Amino acid sequence: MWHGTIPNLAINLQRLAEFFPDKPVMIVETAAYYSHENDPWAKPEQYAEFYPISKEGQTRFTRELVTEIKQHDNVTGLFWWFPEENAFGNNVVKGWLNRGLFDNHTGQVLPAMKEYNRFLP
């Protein structure tokens, strides 16, 4: 994780609610790897401390994130970084692979999407 852990997020969300009780908060540009295939940025040793680079790791990250932010009434938005990202014939994503919510090989929705959808009202 680039910017901290879920427990650190919880602390910051609580502080934001205390200092700015009338302000909505949105979590933006979040994502988690599901594979390190063909992606020079996805280094297993860099992220394994938090969540393994796997479909299961991405799903667990998403589940824990949604579970945490649903405990904070001031969180009104959750935006995944490039959820439609898919290498299937898409040169735009060269170097930005394996963090979307669709499998690069099949184009099918990944299990993390089910967890992501739990945020919706």
Explain the meaning of each model-derived region.
Residues 1-46, 63-70, 74-75:
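Glycoside hydrolase catalytic-domain groove-lining segments
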Residues 35-43, 47-64, 68, 72-121:
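Aromatic-rich peripheral "rim/lid" segments of glycoside hydrolase catalytic domains that contact
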